[in-house]
Design a protein with these regions (language model features):
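Short glycine-rich anion-binding loops that position phosphate/pyrophosphate groups of nucleotides
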Residues: 71-73, 146-149
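Alpha-helix C-terminal capping/helix-to-coil transition sites in glycosyltransferase folds
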Residues: 136-137
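Amphipathic alpha-helical dimerization/coiled-coil segments
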Residues: 28-66
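Beta-hairpin "wing" of winged helix-turn-helix
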Residues: 7-17, 24
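Short, hydrophobic-biased segments on the C-terminal half of alpha helices
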Residues: 3-4
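N-terminal helix-turn-helix DNA-binding core of bacterial DNA-binding proteins
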Residues: 21-29
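Phosphate-binding/catalytic loops
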Residues: 152-225
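Conserved active-site segments centered on acidic
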Residues: 52-131
């Protein structure tokens, strides 16, 4: 009964040899099933699964990186801008939100401009935009708030390396404009430290497990920012 069920599911191949039936594992189908299973239950984290996930690309093209937060109006926008300017041609950088705002936070934009960043092309987007089949697969996905990290998102195509760089929401800061501006300055500084560490990694030469460990190490070392 069990072999029949496995055969019907395409996980074993049945072969007749004389009067006997022999079964062997259908490796391609089984591999695909295991990869999908661990992607769904472990979100592609290699320290929690078998080695089914491929290493991020190393074919010379830029790495695709996505930053996620709730509103995609401040933290993820800052992260997108920082990596784009600090990483240069090594990266194609994007950001999105699980509940994106219609406009970007003016204090976040002001801090970015004060630091010399061009903000003219920035916009808020829903994360579903980056899950469409025509959008390039991500190599890295970072959440910069706890809400986005806990969101029950569908598995990302290609099983990108993931990291959680959670930061307090500067939009919720109270006080005068100057006091609230300091919260955004602190967020900018914390993100800059993380991204400087990320861009210093030899991404092209590290295997997937080593990449995941390095990304997690950045998060752990940044908790005192």
């Amino acid at each position: 009964a069990y072999l029949g069920a496995l055969h019907q599911a395409g996980l074993v191949v049945q072969e007749r040899e004389g009067t006997s039936l022999r079964y062997r594992v259908a490796m391609d189908t089984t591999h695909d099933m295991m990869a999908a299973l661990f992607s769904e239950c472990c979100r592609g984290r290699v320290n929690l699964q078998f080695d089914c996930a491929p290493d991020p690309q190393n074919d010379g093209r830029p790495f695709n990186v996505l930053f996620l937060c709730v509103g995609n109006s401040a933290r993820s926008i800052m992260a997108e801008t920082l990596l784009r300017d600090m990483g240069g041609d090594r990266f194609r950088v994007y950001s999105a939100g699980v509940q994106p705002q219609s406009t970007l936070n003016p204090l976040a934009l002001e801090v970015l401009r004060q630091k010399g960043h061009d903000t003219s092309a920035l916009s808020s987007k829903h994360l579903s935009f980056f899950q469409a089949p025509e959008v390039p697969q991500m190599d890295f996905v970072f959440t910069v708030c706890d809400v986005a990290a806990n969101e029950d998102c569908p598995a990302w195509a290609g099983q990108p390396v993931s990291g959680h760089w959670g930061l307090p929401d500067p939009v919720k800061a109270q006080g005068s404009v100057a006091e609230r501006g300091l919260a955004f300055q602190a967020t900018y500084g914390a993100l800059r430290n993380r991204i400087a560490a990320f861009t210093a990694l030899p991404l092209e030469s590290l295997e997937r497990a080593a990449l995941q460990k390095a990304v997690d190490h950045i998060a752990e070392n940044s908790k005192e920012d």
